[in-house]
Regions:
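Catalytic cores of alpha/beta
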Residues: 43-47, 90-104
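Glycine-rich beta-to-alpha transition loops that act as phosphate-gripper elements at the mouths
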Residues: 84-90
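C-terminal helical cap(s) of enzyme catalytic domains, especially alpha/beta-barrels
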Residues: 114-137
Length: 137
């Protein structure tokens, strides 16, 4: 099972539409939801962004930050759908995930047990605690 983390805490995963692997993305303009690996080039999705409802980006390790870059690039390319980080994202990384463009984080039950909801909620005020805002005073 998976737990979805948002700014309001833990929630069950209610997404029931499934995901298509990036390599199997249909060539037509059918609305879809895509699983993107951490080594993907998001530029390959540029002509399909309006057809994609949700993109779920894999984090194979908490030390692998490529997913943050992919999310940021997708937002800069104009993706307005839902972005979900999936995998080994830690509570300490939640603010960075939100700042880079993610709407939510999907973690497994084991990680949710090791890092309970209160640890994630402590990072939920991600807009108020960013480095550039502190520099501006």
């Amino acid at each position: 099972m998976s737990v979805i983390v948002t700014d309001t805490g833990f929630a069950p995963d209610t997404w029931d539409r499934g995901f298509t692997d990036l390599a199997e993305l249909p060539a037509n303009d059918t609305p879809c939801c895509v699983d993107v690996p951490s080594d993907a080039d998001p530029a390959g999705l540029s002509n399909r962004l309006s057809d994609i409802e949700m993109i779920r980006i894999d984090f194979p390790s908490s030390a692998d930050g490529r997913g943050f870059t992919i999310a940021r690039r997708l937002r800069l390319m104009g993706f307005a759908g839902q972005l979900r980080a999936k995998g080994h994202v830690l509570a300490d990384q939640y603010a960075m995930a939100r700042r880079s463009g993610f709407d939510e984080v999907e973690i497994d039950d084991a990680l949710a047990a090791r890092q309970p909801e209160d640890q994630w909620l402590a990072r939920a005020d991600w807009k108020a605690n960013d480095y550039q805002a502190r520099l501006r005073g």
